[in-house]
């Protein structure tokens, strides 16, 4: 698995699209992992930050949305980490920085007051091309007691398999400073005291067993892409299944006419949990092991 020389010269980018008729964009933030790392007070004298991490241009995009109809607020994070298997430490530190920045943003968003004047946010429930529907007043904004109570979706190409340190940090909320993926390299406090985050994150596909792969080429197949969600605030209600196995027997790799990328699309549908009461768990049938 590698990158073409011309592609390597291109600055990395991520895009997050949302339905403007349904959601209000409250805030948007860009996280550049390399620039964020060198601005840390503990970066001074840490050569690995400058020699291995700072040169990488990978980013994450964070948006903070409010549902016009329900007033529920939530965060959506779209991230892309470094690809090279020889840089497991870089992927881990990018993940740690991502989780730190999301924590700061969510704590700040929890303090945001509700929108009082929603005249500009009135909406119509009519779909494009259908008969005109009456204009509806938006619901009152929901408030949250802490950042980890705000529903969170985090998706992207993490270039990390389920057994990696990056995956473990996201899924468990902590990672010791002596993890072998760090290779005893120095990244300030992140490599001195370990890494943590407060979110109860789960991979959406883990509820049925991770897919066999998300990246499929003739010489490389692995799980690199994920849709993470805060399990204390969100419930998985639907998932897009895996690629047909009979089709895969005839196709050695992607991209091709049917799959325009070597990464397959992941699709998940979520329901926001109420602050009280239980959500009935979806039945996805036999689990994949």
Model-found features: residue ranges?
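Structured beta-strand-rich core segments of catalytic domains in phosphoester-bond hydrolases
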Residues: 1-89, 198, 227, 240-242, ...
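Active-site-proximal segments of metal-dependent phosphoesterases and phosphodiesterases across multiple
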Residues: 81-100, 118-136
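Metal-dependent phosphoester-hydrolase catalytic domains
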Residues: 22, 55, 64, 105-289
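Short, glycine/charged-enriched secondary-structure capping and boundary segments
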Residues: 32, 91-92, 167-171
